Amino acid sequence: MADKVQTTLLFLAVGEFSVGILGNAFIGLVNCMDWVKKRKIASIDLILTSLAISRICLLCVILLDCFILVLYPDVYATGKEMRIIDFFWTLTNHLSIWFATCLSIYYXFRIANFFHPLFLWMKWRIDRVISWILLGCVVLSVFISLPATENLNADFRFCVKAKRKTNLTWSCRVNKTQHASTKLFLNLATLLPFCVCLMSFFLLILSLRRHIRRMQLSATGCRDPSTEAHVRALKAVISFLLLFIAYYLSFLVATSSYFMPETELAVIFGESIALIYPSSHSFILILGNNKLRHASLKVIWKVMSILKGRKFQQHKQIG
């Protein structure tokens, strides 16, 4: 029964992976083509491209981990070859979260309107420093990933190996103090970008409220370009926060799975849920970006035209 559930979850993971690769590759391809054409790249496009690349890598690592867990359980339990995968999963996980946080920060500074001197100073300089912020996210993610992978996953692999030999939950002996400190370190490292996104969300809400109030007082209506920009940014930030919560819970299931009777099943279940975040959020970003949305509509229109042309040719040959 457990094998059937694992196989079903694996097929689900493959489907989520395919959808995620399609959306994120589209974002990266459109922005890179625009970069080559204009010989420069806008800050928002740089953030979206970095986010798309990190999520493509994250999707590949998670799916590879799923395949090895189901098809090669002995390799999964050894802890030697898997250390590389563990490192890249932790790295791409934090890169994806921090790049999404950079996107939220960018929305807050570019769209929100406040007259505090510090906010205005940062608003005017955000385009100049965004590449350095992204580079800092890479350095920070590497700094977090190296010790976390070494400590946390060593205990996890040992536990999986012990359970496969004895089939008893209590046979797993890990250093709980070290494990708890590593989990606390990972949780705090993940909680920081979440809090930053939450602050960006509240800034956008407050800015939108003040803007609508000004528009109502001037009797010019509420549906102006600034309001639309606020709403699009809020949709992107809210979707990230909700999907991030689901992803974080699935991450907790996967990393805490050796306290459960069916470790392998808990891991692949957590990974299947985790794939939803990098897969679905890319399409929300496409719909919220004018250039990406128009490019996607062009692609859909061309595909429909090709399909209609093929149907016409088939009917012509039959007739």
From Swiss-Prot:
SUPFAM superfamilies: Family A G protein-coupled receptor-like. It is a multi-pass membrane protein. It is found in: Membrane. InterPro entries: GPCR_Rhodpsn_7TM, TAS2R. The chain crosses the membrane at residues 10-30, 56-76, 95-115, 129-149, 188-208, 236-256, 267-287. One of its GO terms (cellular component) is plasma membrane. GO terms for biological process: detection of chemical stimulus involved in sensory perception of bitter taste. Keywords: G-protein coupled receptor, Glycoprotein, Membrane, Receptor, Sensory transduction, Taste, Transducer, Transmembrane, Transmembrane helix. The keyword Glycoprotein applies. Gene3D superfamilies: Rhodopsin 7-helix transmembrane proteins. CDD domains: 7tm_TAS2R7-like. It comes from the Eukaryota. It holds the Pfam family TAS2R. Glycans are attached at N167, N175. Residues 1-9, 77-94, 150-187, 257-266 are extracellular. Residues 31-55, 116-128, 209-235, 288-319 are cytoplasmic. One of its GO terms (molecular function) is G protein-coupled receptor activity. Several bitter taste receptors are expressed in a single taste receptor cell. Belongs to the G-protein coupled receptor T2R family. Gustducin-coupled receptor implicated in the perception of bitter compounds in the oral cavity and the gastrointestinal tract. Signals through PLCB2 and the calcium-regulated cation channel TRPM5. This is Taste receptor type 2 member 7. It comes from Pan troglodytes. The gene is TAS2R7.
